[in-house]
Amino acid sequence: MNVRLLTLLFLLPQPALAGPPQVLPGQALFQKNCVRCHGANGKKGANGAHDLTKSNLNAFGRTYLVTNGMGKMPAFGKMLTPEQVQQVVAYSLTLK
């Protein structure tokens, strides 16, 4: 009976081995360009930066702000490609 139990346990699905943490495409860009004011979790609020976890802006609104800036937020449209802007915006929407 012990052999059957061991065989059954061996055949059960095994959890995946932990690998290196997955980095989302916009995460590195966010770390480089946004963390100073928004913080790593989007909640820092330095220099008047909004808490990204409580923002009502959708992807379109965030794309506009990242590209053109507003108030104290600088425009990143000349520093980032449109694809990079989309990656940063997509990453910012994952912050909770």
Question: How would you label these PLM feature ranges?
Answer:
Residues 1-8:
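Sec-dependent signal peptide recognition
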Residues 19, 43-44, 94-96:
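Inter-heme linker and motif-flanking segments adjacent to c-type heme-binding CXXCH motifs
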Residues 13-15:
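N-terminal signal peptide c-region/cleavage motif recognized by signal peptidases
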Residues 23-27, 31, 39-67:
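Gly/Gly-Pro-rich "capping" loops immediately C-terminal to redox-active cysteine motifs
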Residues 61-79:
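Short Fe-S-cluster ligation motifs
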Residues 32-35, 71:
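Glycine-centered loop/turn positions within well-structured domains
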Residues 66, 78-96:
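C-terminal capping alpha-helices of c-type cytochrome domains
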